[in-house]
Regions:
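Adenine nucleotide phosphate-binding catalytic loops in nucleotide-utilizing enzymes
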Residues: 99, 123, 129-137, 150-151, ...
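Phosphate-binding loop of NTP-binding sites
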Residues: 1-154, 160-171
Length: 215
């Protein structure tokens, strides 16, 4: 500070140097961010999409596929920029903790996602947030930066998230639920096996079956 050397926060640097021209898929929420981010990045790579990612933990990879082993050997991967086949996707664990000692905004405010997955929203980080409303304000700031041609994906019947969206949102929303708890959600899941390794996914009039070995 005394030498007036230019500095920036990690989230701002990431946004300006990596995310600016990517289709950012941000996974936010109080719980489950690391797991959901890993699952989303894995699904994209399994589908042949060379998505970049930043995960808040090193993934445990159980595969013989060398391509997947290399990509998931660390918690971050740059991925490919936009190509003829797909946008340059980047999956990021979007943390609500503050950005730096000089920038008390949540990290995810910098990321400007096109798609946001909001897992849940509860009171957390009592060292920097006085109450749930303060966290909701930060989520509101992120939501307002998601474009109208983007998407918000969130669980149905989550009061704290619904309250946040009522403050202002111009992005289409997909609500998800287990079919037995909310048959009116946009996306529904129905367990076929109780351990979660096999389930059905319903959207509109379409049904797909998922066989998932990472339950």
């Amino acid at each position: 500070l005394n030498e007036r050397i230019p500095y920036t926060s990690g989230p701002q640097f990431l946004a300006e140097q990596v995310l600016q021209y990517r289709h950012v898929l941000a996974v936010a929420g109080t719980h489950g961010k690391t797991t959901t981010t890993t699952m989303l990045a894995w699904i994209l790579h399994y589908a042949g999409i060379d998505a970049g990612f930043l995960i808040g933990g090193v993934p445990l990879v159980d595969t013989q596929d060398e391509r997947l082993q290399q990509a998931f050997a660390h918690s971050s991967y740059l991925g490919s920029d936009k190509t003829a086949n797909h946008e340059g996707y980047f999956v990021i664990e979007a943390d609500e903790y503050d950005s730096a000692f000089f920038d008390k905004r949540s990290k995810f405010v910098h990321y400007r996602p096109t798609t946001a997955i909001l897992n849940n929203l509860e009171y957390d980080h009592a060292d920097i947030f006085p109450n749930l409303a303060a966290i909701q304000t930060q989520f509101h700031h992120m939501v307002r930066m998601i474009p109208s041609n983007g998407k918000i994906i969130m669980p149905a019947d989550t009061e704290s998230l619904e309250e946040t969206l009522k403050k202002g949102c111009w992005t289409p929303i997909w609500r998800t639920a287990i079919a037995s708890t909310n048959p009116h959600a946009d996306w529904q899941a129905k367990l076929v096996k109780q351990d979660g390794s096999q389930y059905e996914v319903m959207f509109d009039d379409h049904t797909g079956q998922v066989n998932w070995q990472m339950s």
